[in-house]
Amino acid sequence: MKHWKRKTSKEIQERIDKALGENSSFYDEPIIGMPCSYLDSKVFPHGNPILNNAPFLQTLINNPNHIGCHTVATSEITFSGTQKIERELLNIVACDIFKAEEGEFDGYVPSGGTEANMQAVWIYREFFKKNNGFSLDEIAIVCSSDTHYSIPKASNILSVQIHKVPVDTVTRQMSPSGLSNAFSELRENGVKGIIFVANMMTTMFGSVDKLDVITEALLESKLEFKLHIDGAYGGFFYPFANESNNMNFENEHVNSITVDAHKMAQAPYGTGIFLIRKGFMGYTHSKEASYVKGEDYTLVGSRSGANAVAVWMILSAHGPNGWKEKTHILKHRVDWLCKELDAAKVNYFREANSNIVSLSAACVLPEVARKYQIVPDDHHAPKWYKIIVMEHVEVEDLEMFLADLNIAVLQ
């Protein structure tokens, strides 16, 4: 690991202090030209003792705006210190987790996976239009039927047609023939450019799309394509649970990756990560943002620098070995759960190396689902309920659930 090192609490505090010191201060400097300030002082007083030894809260109250994309262009000098923290974070995630070459990627910290996925579709839509001369009718998003709803949302907002490939109900995988048929149908309808979204752990099942099958079908189709990985859920889990996976930038076909830090990384909500190979952010360059130093390339515009700092702090506190240990503890709990479900003859789906277990709705009474707040695939007509083993889910919680589940099964 070149960039990712474990740090002590003191080292983290000192690094954030340095970053905030490099930012301009709304408390101490005559900044009169910007539509931003520190957080409201009547509610969030600067001298509150709660801020002592609390670097995230200190950053939050200073309220840095990380507008723009700091890997592409110059940025507002007002927040240069915390922008460096964001770049350090992106180096950790891009290079040390997703195996990008240093300096060969761009990215930023968006509001979450939905925005990051939308950013990818927006970039590739503009790429196909400007680089290939394709019309909107000649561009299509392709994904599995298990893909997150942010992709249909991106299709709607960006006016790019979408084609969902069915999955096998047992394996949750798209078949080679299903992919080939989808590409043939699209080609016959005049589509020339494919934005393919592959899943690194789907939201409902934790299933992982097989990239080799997808890329083989894409190459055989002779269609132009860009491959985006939606790792919003799995990005901070799957690379550590399955270190031999090929969903990273060492795979020449992978062009961009979405990760959500407010899921498995347990960062504050409104925190994702978007990564893409160098040379593509420019397709969404908003030159009209001429009053912003470096202008803008992102969907969201203004965004909190405190969120980037929070993720950097979390990863730094654990370090790579601590993160692997955390992942394997959760995976071990899921292994135990699945053995118990097998013994009880409960029908479920679990992707190998996943911490999501989806139970057949026929095995789950509504009162059990309510008690444990397990989530259905459809609140109107559920076929599956999912269990997600997060850090707070102990084996004792699972034992209690299994006891109630077994009573329901016997009934």
Segment roles from a protein language model:
Residues 240-243, 247-351:
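Active-site C-terminal subdomain of aminotransferase-like
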